Amino acid sequence: MLCFLSISVAAESLKNERILIITSYNPDTEKTNANLKEFFKEYERLTGYTANICIENMNCKNLSEGMQWKDRMAKLLENHKATPPNLIILLGQEAWASFLSQTSDMARKTPSMGAMIGTNAIEAPKEKDINLRTFMPNSSEYPSFTNFNIVGGIFYKYDVERNIELIRKFYPNTKNIAFLSDFTLGGLTLQALVRKTMEEKYKDLNLILLDGRRSTVFEVCTQIQKLPPHTALLLGTWRIDSSDNYVLANTTGPISKAAPNVPAFSLSSIGM
């Protein structure tokens, strides 16, 4: 899915604005590159000018290095202190969460936008020695971050409630929801949203976490095979397992075949 940022202010005034784009991943990665191309194309169409745009890269890899991201973001912002931007655009969940953990005036007061992110977010942990494999953060919707000057963006809406209702419509005897997530910030953010929704609205259902932060793809397969009766599988994300290795497409096959009689629904575009 391409995120398209449409700018509808006077073209001449845009030329005088400094725009800082901070990406979670290398700008050459497919999704990031596609989003940047669309932004530059539209911006140049409106202004005929792109020299006022600067791109920084957090070079995030996996969640095991997540405790470094807050400081990494702070250093990137510090690099632009002499000539502060008029707008900061964050591409990716890692950049977004790291930005929302900042306390500087630049981060809090500069107009900011997000893309390639969900409407829900988690803040990076304040403790330096926290174990990210067991960290259970709270989920917040982006409008709740009132101490930041968030002016807009492109957000994915993950509707957990409608998915649960769909599961109950097809399988009214469902007693357990098994949620699959991986060892990425996106996986942890989705898991936090699912936990929050289940705790607030579905206390009659039992939530089973198939957590890639602590399980390999093969361990998850075993867990799926041992799921109790009346369980539905809700798919979140699956790119990196507990071994810190990216999961290849041919390794997701065993998950989909682990228990073919267990009904499966997808919260994201994972599909499997």
Q: Positions of the model-derived regions?
A:
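Bacterial N-terminal signal peptides
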Residues: M1-S6
